[in-house]
């Protein structure tokens, strides 16, 4: 995983992607994937990521992530 990450970071730097943009996109994708893996269950996804439920809710709203499979 470390080698893949280093290659990705190198590519991003070459393309001029800024740190804040990279961090934001990583967080958005990471949260969306965890939420999908937990079938839209916000509490389970928050637990998987080690986030508080309120933080997870705020970030899902902030990034406008759709909760597929949510009841």
What is each PLM-predicted segment?
Residues 2-71:
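Bacterial C-terminal helix-turn-helix
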